[in-house]
């Protein structure tokens, strides 16, 4: 399959630079996987689409203020984007500079350059940085870091983004991008879903900056997926198996929840799914056999991205590309701060290719 098979025309005006004033008031395009039928509505329509006993699986990662600005002690300006926190003193990061720093380079970070750090090692495209500060890394990031808005949101981050670019149920710091399907859930909607009898479970996948990296090969089978840390604890496994046993659906909130659950299913030795704690490089594209997910809530993704490939593997290639064409025609808002989709599984998707 060619990367260009997953391309579509998107006017710049449809890229959302700010979220809706109310989280759950975004538009919702529903795609019936088996038939390809599309319906238009708002996000709160989920109350009618979900049944008592259905299981929603959320990603409870919390976005860290992962973008740092400063300079090398020798003078050159730098921008640091944290990929992951290694421990209380060290990070693994992307560094943008006129000349890549060498091991031993001292970095002065923050508006007042008061935070000192040292680049200690290089691992491919990533740099290991150690802070020379008594505070834990997370405290330093909270003090001087900027929210790492995606590159297609063409504006500086604002104070409001610290709340808006965060799910209301975020709990475990570590992501450098939000699991954006979850941004549409507010407390009243969550309460209404619970009252209806919808079950909820929480995985953790710390989204890395690699999620924004373009696919740089022509043939998608040649793409090497970036690695991200995921946790699928025993209580999530129990909730999934219980939902399946009673005939209810497992509904992933976002592609990161999909990748977490499917990673746990791939690693399982005996049951449908088993607990999973570790890095995953799972790459889902047409031809993949889904093992756990019955429905998916997700935002609209970039052309030629691994995420539109994941959706195509779930709903079917033709149904997915037709849904995106319709979304553009109907002026849905795209990407992280944009509108959402509710998609049910197409069992014929596994045999569909572009």
Curated annotation (Swiss-Prot):
Its EC number is 2.4.99.17. Its main location: cytoplasm. Keywords: Cytoplasm, Queuosine biosynthesis, S-adenosyl-L-methionine, Transferase. It catalyses: 7-aminomethyl-7-carbaguanosine(34) in tRNA + S-adenosyl-L-methionine = epoxyqueuosine(34) in tRNA + adenine + L-methionine + 2 H(+). It is found in: Cytoplasm. Pathway: tRNA modification; tRNA-queuosine biosynthesis. GO terms for cellular component: cytoplasm. It comes from the Bacteria. Signal peptide: none annotated. The keyword Transferase applies. GO terms for molecular function: S-adenosylmethionine:tRNA ribosyltransferase-isomerase activity. One of its GO terms (biological process) is tRNA wobble guanine modification. Gene3D superfamilies: QueA-like. Monomer. Belongs to the QueA family. Transfers and isomerizes the ribose moiety from AdoMet to the 7-aminomethyl group of 7-deazaguanine (preQ1-tRNA) to give epoxyqueuosine (oQ-tRNA). This is S-adenosylmethionine:tRNA ribosyltransferase-isomerase.
């Amino acid at each position: 399959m060619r990367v260009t098979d997953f391309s579509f025309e998107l006017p710049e005006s449809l890229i959302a630079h700010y979220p809706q004033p109310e989280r759950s008031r975004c538009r919702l395009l529903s795609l019936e996987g088996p038939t390809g039928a599309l319906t238009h509505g708002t996000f709160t329509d989920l109350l009618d689409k979900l049944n008592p006993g259905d299981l929603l699986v959320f990603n409870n990662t919390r976005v860290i203020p992962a973008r740092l600005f400063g300079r090398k002690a020798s003078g050159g300006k730098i921008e640091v984007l944290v990929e992951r926190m290694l421990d209380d003193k060290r990070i693994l990061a992307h560094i943008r500079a006129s000349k890549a720093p060498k091991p031993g380079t001292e970095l002065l970070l923050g508006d007042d350059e008061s935070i000192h750090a040292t680049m200690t090692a290089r691992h491919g495209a990533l740099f290991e940085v150690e802070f020379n500060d008594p505070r834990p890394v997370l405290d330093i990031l909270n003090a001087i870091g900027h929210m790492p808005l995606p590159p297609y949101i063409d504006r500086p981050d604002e104070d409001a983004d610290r709340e808006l670019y965060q799910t209301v149920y975020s709990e475990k710091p570590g992501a450098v991008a939000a699991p954006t399907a979850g941004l549409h859930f507010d407390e009243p909607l969550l309460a209404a879903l619970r009252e209806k009898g919808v079950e909820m479970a929480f995985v953790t996948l710390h989204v890395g900056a690699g999620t924004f990296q373009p696919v740089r090969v022509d043939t998608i089978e040649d793409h090497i997926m970036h690695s991200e840390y995921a946790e699928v604890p025993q209580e999530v496994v129990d909730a999934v198996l219980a939902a399946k046993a009673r005939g209810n659906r497992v509904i992933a909130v976002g592609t990161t929840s999909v990748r977490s659950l499917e990673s746990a299913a791939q690693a399982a030795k005996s049951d449908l799914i088993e607990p999973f704690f570790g890095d995953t490089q799972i790459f889902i594209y047409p031809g993949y056999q889904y093992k756990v997910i019955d429905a998916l809530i997700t935002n609209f993704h970039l052309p030629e991205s691994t995420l539109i490939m994941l959706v195509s593997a779930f709903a079917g290639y033709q149904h997915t590309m037709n849904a995106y064409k319709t979304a553009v025609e109907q002026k849905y808002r795209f990407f992280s701060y944009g509108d959402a989709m509710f998609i049910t599984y197409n069992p014929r998707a596994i045999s569909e290719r572009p």
